[in-house]
């Protein structure tokens, strides 16, 4: 994921599912060094991860 998209997700009114190594995360902050501060939804653990390791989960094609 790039920094611009991560920032769009933070600012969005919608809930957009983002995964880090298969685990759902909430992006807390995009940092200048191509890192993001995230919190893991199921464990509440927080850490800094590289933006390239974040994946936006796509909605099913038949989702309306």
Curated annotation (Swiss-Prot):
Entry-linked InterPro entries: SASP_SspH
Keywords: Sporulation
Membrane-spanning intervals of the chain: none
Keyword Nucleus in record: no
Predominant subcellular localization, coarse grouping: other
A GO-annotated cellular component: endospore-forming forespore
Location relative to the cell: Spore core
GO biological process: asexual sporulation; sporulation resulting in formation of a cellular spore
Disulfide bonds: none
Protein family membership: Belongs to the SspH family.
Protein's name in the database: Small, acid-soluble spore protein H
Organism listed in the record: Acetivibrio thermocellus (strain ATCC 27405 / DSM 1237 / JCM 9322 / NBRC 103400 / NCIMB 10682 / NRRL B-4536 / VPI 7372)
């Amino acid at each position: 994921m790039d920094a611009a998209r991560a920032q769009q997700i933070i600012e969005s009114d919608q809930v957009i599912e983002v995964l880090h190594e298969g685990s759902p995360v909430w992006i807390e902050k995009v940092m200048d060094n191509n890192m993001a501060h995230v919190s893991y939804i199921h464990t509440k653990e927080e850490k800094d991860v590289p933006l390239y390791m974040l994946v936006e989960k796509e909605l099913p094609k038949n989702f309306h």
